[in-house]
């Protein structure tokens, strides 16, 4: 889905800089269908054959999480730069290993943390960096879908995805939050998961858009709730080396309204997102401040707009005109956080960073 709806349309938008040469899917008919739909000249069902025959400069990995490590390494070793869907991996050591390989081979490895590409988030990050909020001590994420369980693909199977709601939609919010905060290292995590609604509810209608398939799906897979062995709901508390406490709630399914909210508190001001608003004082008065923000550009209204801005950014990085803004250390930090979270939820206690190293 994300290849057809996000990556490929974004590449085509920058046809003056990149050309789509081939597509690969283990399902040969799906590869052929994608190639025909997007006028891509070659299609494959064998990754090694594609890499050997096409010699791509850049590869997008848009496969289930469990396959990321192997495919990213294979593409890097074939001489390609790589854009990989999030999360790169759910483990600290695997993520460190991939970035070490990319550095050794002199290639760029970029993870699709596309939620960063929003004007309000850039503004919030600048305010924080400029000290407008003062010393930050608390942050919160509230990312809830009422009924947004992906009923397509393999998101609900641990063997394929490694995790559920947190690894799917929560990782975007977590990455954006840590980035806005200046990328403090997460030192400890306490986590909780639940899957009660998926396994108890029957007959309720889900909409594809609710589950993130804004443009629909091209190769739907029959959804069987009995297969689901990942969390529909995740909550956690993080502690960072900067002294910031970060709490979050993430859900594919919850008996609440949809929401995608963030809150950051400092000793001078606080702010809320996604509609950026600051709360502080001015002189002797309490003050609310709503900056007038404009979009990032012409792709704001596209489905998966963040992929357009990410790929434009990657083109700039490869051309030497931009510095990579999704750095190895940032991605390693979120991978460590995911690993600590899932281990904590299994053990029923807080897990510290040194326990996963």
Question: Which residue stretches match the model-derived regions?
Answer:
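N-terminal Rossmann-like dinucleotide-binding module
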Residues: 1-38
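C-terminal helix-rich "cap/oligomerization" subdomain common to oxidoreductases
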Residues: 58-60, 104-107, 241, 313-357
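Hydrophobic residues in well-ordered beta-strands that form the structural core
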Residues: 4, 44, 84, 109-111, ...
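Predominantly a Rossmann-like dinucleotide-binding segment in NAD(P)-dependent oxidoreductases
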Residues: 2-3, 115-225, 348
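Beta-strand-loop-alpha-helix segment that lines the small-molecule cofactor/substrate pocket
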Residues: 51-53, 57-58, 64-65, 69-116, ...
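Contiguous beta-strand/loop segments that form the cofactor/metal-binding neighborhood of enzyme cores
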Residues: 150, 175-279, 310-321, 339-340, ...
